[in-house]
């Protein structure tokens, strides 16, 4: 593994190795406290962030490395100076680049023109670090992730894409339950289905909640992406039937709940569920750091 732009570039064994390493780092942090000693990692943010920024900054520190934070400064990467020059400069100083960007093409440019590993910490198409943290969390409760049935509910987006691709590679069953007109990208769904054929997994897209009865895990996300100015009344009309609430858990028999956050309580998920016995949401947030640490250790070993 030279970079992490999308989980589709990883094999099943590489994903399992990352999950195993994440568990090892989580269980024995002192053993890895100097693993990145002398390493400097530039973290770039074109989009706002809480969990991504804090977990990368603290995670790198816990591994003995040094994180250098860059915000959007005078605009997106490539506006003030070319992506080529940006990547070439950063590569002379830093040992890796972690980038949360508007466009996947920016990440591809950083890889093309830079000479250090690049990690996608979110783009318009994928959120691979989130998906690794999600399956790390699932693996803490299910010994064989290939037997897990995971339902994503809400708007098809970058998180959905990475969940489907990761589940497909691992051989799990992943169903995206989205209102009509909000399905995941058709080409990425096609890629996930092809990967699932190889692994024995299953990928589904539906708008019917009855299709996820007897699933193991349900996964929520915000109904409104950053920068979306759709009136709340319209959003609620479209998505409220897909709210994750106690009634839905009873109806489907689902045991565990995930949400990548930020969560809008009483919209896509109720406080009763988010703070309840079925919720793994804050374990999931913690696991962002451990999964990302595993990625950095693998890239910089």
Curated annotation (Swiss-Prot):
Biological processes per GO annotation: arginine biosynthetic process via ornithine; citrulline biosynthetic process; L-arginine biosynthetic process
Source organism of the structure: Moritella profunda
Keyword Nucleotidyltransferase: no
GO CC terms: cytoplasm
This protein's encoding gene: argF
Main location: cytoplasm
Source organism superkingdom: Bacteria
Catalytic reaction annotation: carbamoyl phosphate + L-ornithine = L-citrulline + phosphate + H(+)
Binding site for carbamoyl phosphate: 100, 127-130, 260, 288
Role this protein plays: Reversibly catalyzes the transfer of the carbamoyl group from carbamoyl phosphate (CP) to the N(epsilon) atom of ornithine (ORN) to produce L-citrulline.
InterPro entries: Asp/Orn_carbamoyltranf_P-bd, Asp/Orn_carbamoylTrfase, Asp/Orn_carbamoylTrfase_sf, Asp_carbamoyltransf_Asp/Orn-bd, Orn/put_carbamltrans, OTCase_ArgI
Keyword match Cytoplasm: yes
Binding site for L-ornithine: 158, 221, 225-226
Lineage, top ranks: Bacteria, Pseudomonadati, Pseudomonadota, Gammaproteobacteria, Alteromonadales
Record protein name field: Ornithine carbamoyltransferase
Similarity comment text for this entry: Belongs to the aspartate/ornithine carbamoyltransferase superfamily. OTCase family.
Keywords: Amino-acid biosynthesis, Arginine biosynthesis, Cytoplasm, Transferase
Pfam families for this protein: OTCace, OTCace_N
Quaternary state and interactors: Homododecamer.
């Amino acid at each position: 593994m030279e970079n992490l732009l999308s989980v589709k570039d990883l094999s099943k064994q590489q994903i399992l190795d990352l999950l195993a390493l994440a568990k090892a780092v989580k269980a024995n942090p002192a053993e890895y406290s100097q693993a990145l000693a002398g390493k400097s990692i530039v973290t770039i943010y074109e989009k706002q962030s809480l969990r991504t920024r804090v977990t990368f900054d603290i995670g790198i520190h816990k591994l003995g490395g040094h994180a250098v934070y860059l915000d959007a400064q005078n605009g997106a990467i490539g506006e003030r100076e070319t992506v080529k020059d940006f990547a070439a400069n950063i590569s002379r100083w830093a040992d890796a680049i972690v980038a949360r960007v508007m466009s996947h093409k920016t990440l591809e440019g950083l890889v093309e023109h830079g000479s250090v590993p690049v990690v996608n910490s979110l783009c318009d198409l994928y959120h691979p670090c989130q998906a690794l943290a999600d399956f790390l969390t699932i693996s803490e409760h299910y010994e064989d992730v290939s037997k897990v049935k995971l339902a994503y509910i809400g708007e098809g987006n970058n998180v959905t894409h990475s969940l489907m691709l990761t589940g497909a590679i691992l051989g799990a069953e992943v169903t995206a339950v989205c209102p009509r007109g909000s399905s995941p990208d058709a080409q990425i769904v096609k890629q996930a289905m092809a990967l699932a054929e190889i692994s024995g997994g299953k990928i589904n897209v539906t708008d019917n909640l009855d299709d996820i009865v007897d699933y193991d895990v349900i996964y929520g996300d915000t109904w409104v992406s950053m920068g979306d100015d759709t009136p709340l009344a319209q959003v609620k009309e479209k998505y409220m039937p897909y709210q994750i609430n106690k009634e839905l858990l009873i109806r489907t028999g689902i045991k565990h709940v995930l949400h990548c956050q930020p969560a809008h309580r009483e919209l896509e998920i109720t406080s009763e569920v988010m703070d309840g016995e079925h919720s793994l949401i804050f374990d999931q947030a913690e696991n962002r750091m451990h999964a990302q640490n595993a990625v950095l250790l693998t890239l910089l070993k």
